[in-house]
Structures are given as structure tokens and as C-alpha cells.
Amino acid sequence: MGSACEAGTDEPSRDDVKGTGNGILENGHSHKPEEEEWRNGMGEDLPNGHSTPPEPQQTDEQKEHQVQIVRWERFLPVKTLRVLLVENDDSTRQVVSALLRKCCYEVIPAENGLHAWQCLEDLQNHIDLVLTEVVMPRLSGIGLLSKITSHKICKDIPVIMMSSNDSMGTVFKCLSKGAVDFLVKPIRKNELKNLWQHVWRRCHSSSGSGSESGIRTQKCTKPKVDDEYENNSGSNNDNEDDDDNDEDDDDLSVGHNARDGSDNGSGTQSSWTKRAVEIDSPQQMSPDQPSDLPDSTCAQVIHPTSEICSNRWLPTANKRSGKKHKENNDDSMGKYLEIGAPRNSSMEYQSSPREMSVNPTEKQHETLMPQSKTTRETDSRNTQNEPTTQTVDLISSIARSTDDKQVVRINNAPDCSSKVPDGNDKNRDSLIDMTSEELGLKRLKTTGSATEIHDERNILKRSDLSAFTRYHTTVASNQGGAGFGGSCSPQDNSSEALKTDSNCKVKSNSDAAEIKQGSNGSSNNNDMGSSTKNAITKPSSNRGKVISPSAVKATQHTSAFHPVQRQTSPANVVGKDKVDEGIANGVNVGHPVDVQNSFMQHHHHVHYYVHVMTQQQQQPSIERGSSDAQCGSSNVFDPPIEGHAANYSVNGSFSGGHNGNNGQRGPSTAPNVGRPNMETVNGIVDENGAGGGNGSGSGSGNDLYQNGVCYREAALNKFRQKRKVRNFGKKVRYQSRKRLAEQRPRIRGQFVRQSGQEDQAGQDEDR
């Protein structure tokens, strides 16, 4: 082959090669079609100085004529690629060497990394490509790769790593060190066929103009004896054409390398000369800094694109800035209200070094970022500290949007009424200081003097509740009251109905605090899940007055179903004539109206609670009763005591009642007003503190809780007994079979048939 090359390059016009059919005769030796195909591929892809592409006219003539004269320099390069194969396993090294030679490579085998490094230091070997194993004794493949990339001369040699361990950590480590590809064992033949492309890429990136490549201005030389003849054999026109093709192919290959590291001609090749190497290399690329990365191949290839196409990210960056302004507008409108720390928009806006824009307008957007951040902070702070003008609007808005958890203060809330006793100033001051965290629906907690209620939601002992009892609660007040109230926890028998004065104060009967059943530990608890009786109790100083909100003012009728969207309690059932009827039924109003606000909470569907009652069977006896001056109540089945009904009544929606501490209790009748599903009980405290209504304590939370525990214990004992009996039967059966098996004779581990007498004896023993 060498003689043919020398003769062909000295006298190209006379010395030719005759081709016969698909094979080519070279000095009497025939080349295989596979080698011819590989050489044709090399001729089309290798840069100038190696060969020139064949002319299409000659190809047509070759098809027409069996014998055609082909110039040797028109054919593919004379020299072959020399591959240094580094593999410590002998059999693998021999197999891969044979495959490489079959793919027309020259192979220099090496047993370990030190031997390979000695071969590389010998410049007479002229190694074009290194194919090395990752794990090797003495000097590993990664160590060899580091030595190659740090060497002054050998750093231009492409290094391909191969290993049977294809973990991402190993692959990424090799590629970040400067490897151009990673092959997973077992290696396929088509992967070895495409190894020349790495050499072509390295030569291609270094043979371009200096302005594009940045650092590689000299061409990749293949030091061999035949290189002089090769470089001088092409014509000037061919060289110019190749230069143009090189520039076009350079842009194409750069685009592919930026994406997946393979170009169109690679076929099955999956090259790893990609952005991952650039990202994890110790010296990262940036458009402002020259690319002098000795250990990264793709840095040489990607750098021109980062300079030429640096403006491609401008639309994206501007779009991102526009999106930031839109988010700021949304924040000002209240769509994205932040209670905690605001988002760090600078971290979101930060881009990678490759996506840094050179547009000054984008930098201007960057300077505006802290200002927008502070704007969002102030908006959030103003939203949190914004005083309300109407307390009723505040409460109803919180009730309508229970998902909104903003902190709202009522420091500047106007005084709702002038009818305020002088002795309540201390309560007013303590209530004004309360934040909305203390006045929220989900946490009612009042801090004040001993006469005030300490409302803490005690969520203990929730296991006996149904899934239907935990619903949203709507609280509203009449005529601008602070309107919080209502419902006591289902296991508190001594809880008091809340009363809101017109100046936003919450009070309760002080005597009720002395009656504790020990179920929750606190005398007054608010439960969001249960419904509330509209009950009014007076403070200890004014407890001698009889108050009926329905008889006092017609606009304050109580209703079992309180609409969520309304701010005041509507008269859903009863009109003014019903109020007069209630007054005629024996309500004595002897006190001027200084309490006009009742606590309303949203009542849910009654059939839910009936279903709860039938499932839990928590109240064995249900007594019929209602309180005096009942406005709009239909059939009342729960025993109300001082404005409270048992939480485990038919509806399952009312808080636990008193156990009869306040004097007389008598059943009374109430007009039936056409809504059988709504049941409301108003308990009124008269001058003597007597509670109107039936005072049976059948709905006691402790009794019901104990009943539920008893039911569970009984069911558990029954289950355990059944399991014990079942297991006992299994145990007896197992033991009898075991005893029979031990008695049966065996020969070599196999049972043998017994005689009839022995069988009869075994059966007698079983009996």
C-alpha cells in the first residue's frame, strides 16, 4: 500500500488503479467492499489535506464501464487511523483489537495505563485515538485521561473511555475530565466503525480559522511518512472547496454537539461531546472569556457558537422580564399575596453563563428587580396590616373565603353602638388589642380579665366524631358587632353560649365557668364543626334581666340555616306577627335592649346529623322540648339547657348542655313553622337565672364518650374471642395431624401403608 501511495503521489497522471466490479485491485491485491465503503466515508468527511471527494461523472462512467481508471489521490486517504487500545484483560483486548483491525484501524495494544502512557510519550508512534478501559491496575483509565489532557502535546488526542459499568457517576466523571465518548461493554462493531469521527471532529475544530476556534489555529497533523505527499497531492480548487465545506460543516457539527454530541453522519454513534462536559469541567465557558480548556473537546467546538449566537437568548430574556412585570402587577392586585418571606426573584432570574445576554435593556430589567421585590413586600405588608372599615364585612369575607389566611387587624374598627355600659371599658380595650389570629375562625382565643371567656379550640377526643361534623363555620353579627361565637365543643357540658356586645365584647355567664365535667378541661370552647344555638346570656352583673332577641327587635330573628353570603341574620321563618306571638307566650321583657347581637353559625344539612346519630347510637333516649320565646323553630328534639342543646342529639349539631345548675327547667311548646328540617333552640336566662327548656342530661358528652368506648371494647372483645376460637380449631387440627404423622412408619422418608389394626388403633387414639 505504501509503494502504491508513493508511486501515485509522484506521478498521479500515469500511475492508476484498475477497478473490477465492486472490488478494487491494488498491485494485484483486492480490497473488500466493506473496506471500500469505509474509505468512501472517510473521503467524504475528512477535511482538506487528506483527500478530495470523487466526481459524480466518474461514478457514472464506472457504472457504465466495467473497467475504469481511477486516480489514487481521488480515492480515500492512504493512511489509516492508529488507535491505542488500553485493556488489562487479555481476551477482551484481543477481541477488540481484532474488531478494530477489521474496521481498518491500526491497533497498538497496551496492558495497563503505564504502558499506554509510555506509548504516548514515544512520539514515533503517532497515535491518533486512545481507547481505554476505566478500571485498570496501577494507572486507571481516568488517571491516564488526566495525564493525556494535561500533557502539552497529547492533549489533542481524543480519548474514548469504555467500561462495563455504565453508571451516570462514572460516565459523567469521565466526560467531565475530557473524554470525548463513553462506550459501554460489550462493544458493538458499528461503534468501532464510527471512532474515526472523533478524530475528524478534533481535526475539524482545530483546522478552522483562528477567529472561530479561538485557540486552535494550527491544523491537526498526522505525523507519518506519507503526509507530505498527501498534503501536496490535492489541487488548489479542491482545497478551496473543502474550506467552504469545512465552514458549513463546522456550524452544523457545532449545533449537534450543543444538543447531543453527534452529527448527521454518525449513524448509530452516540457521542458524548456535549454540554455536560462544558458544565462540569473545572473551567467553565463564558462569552467574555477565551476558551483555553485543555481538557474539554466540546469547549473548542461550542465556543464559536456562544460568541456568534449570543443574541439568540435576547427574546427569551425579554420575555422572562415581561413575565416578571406581569407577576408584579398580579401581586399588586392581590393574586399572589405572600405571608412569609417573599420570593427571591433574583435567584429565579439568574441564568447560566451561556445564557447571559448582552442587551443593555435586560440589564436595566435586572436593576429594577430589587425595586419590584420591595414593592411586593410592601404590598404584602399593607395587605396584612390593612384595617377594616366594617367589622361585619371583615367577618363575612373571612367566612366566605376560608382558604384566605391573611392576618387582619381590627385596631381601627369603628365603634358600632353607643349603648355601652361604663363597666365594660376594660373588656373593650382588651378586645381591640386582639389580632385576627385570635379572632380567626379556626382559632378563637381571647385574652383578657377573669370575667372574659378564654376560648380555646380543644381538639382532643375527636375520635368519636363523624366525618360530617367538621365543616366550615360561618359567623355573622347583627349591626356591626364583632360576631364571633358560638358553638361549644361536643364534649363540653359546661360550655356557655357567647354573647357579643355592640362594642365588640365577648362575655359569658361567670357561673357557668364553675361547672366543669372534666371532658375538655376548659369551660368554654368553640367548635367549628357543630352548629350553634342563638342563646344570649348576661354578664354576672346584669344576670337578672330577661332578654329575648326575637322579642326585642324584629330584624334579629334567629334562624337555623344562616346563609353564608349574608352579613346579618335574616328572618327566614318568622315575621313580626310571630314575634308578637312569642311575646304573648310569656316572655317578660323588662330591660332596655343593650345586647342586640346574636352568634350565628352555619347549619349544615340536618340529614347528615341524623345519619350521624343513627350510626353512632350515642343518645339512647330523646326528649322533646323547646325554649320559651322560640322564633321560627320546628320540632325540637334536643334538650336545651340555658341556650345549649346536647351535641349528640338528633341533629348532632348542637353543643352539650348544662346538667341542670340554673334552677327550674320546664318543657314548653313552640309554634311549628313549616320547616321540619330546621331545628333551633333559643335558651333564655330569666331574672333568677332559670334556664328555659328541658334540662335532661341525656346528651352528656362524657356519657356518650363512655358509651362509645364501651361499644368499641365490646366489639374488640368479640373479635378477639372469635379469633381465639378459630385459632384453637386450627391448632387442634394441626396437632392431631402431627401426632398421626409421627406414628406412621416411614421408609426413606416416605410414608408406608399401615396394617388395618394399626389404622384402627390410630383412630381410637384420635377419639
Swiss-Prot record:
Keywords of the record: Biological rhythms, Nucleus, Transcription, Transcription regulation, Two-component regulatory system
Q: Cite the record's Basic residues compositional bias ranges.
A: 727-738
Where in or outside the cell is it found?
Answer: Nucleus
Q: Where is the composition biased (Low complexity)?
A: 205-214, 518-531
For this chain's UniProt record, which GO biological process terms are given? cytokinin-activated signaling pathway; phosphorelay signal transduction system; rhythmic process
Induction (UniProt): Expressed with a circadian rhythm showing a broad peak in the middle day.
- Composition bias, kind Polar residues: at what positions? 263-272, 343-361, 488-497, 532-543
Belongs to which family? Belongs to the ARR-like family.
Kindly provide the name given to this protein in its UniProt entry.
Two-component response regulator-like PRR73
Q: Give the originating organism.
A: Oryza sativa subsp. japonica
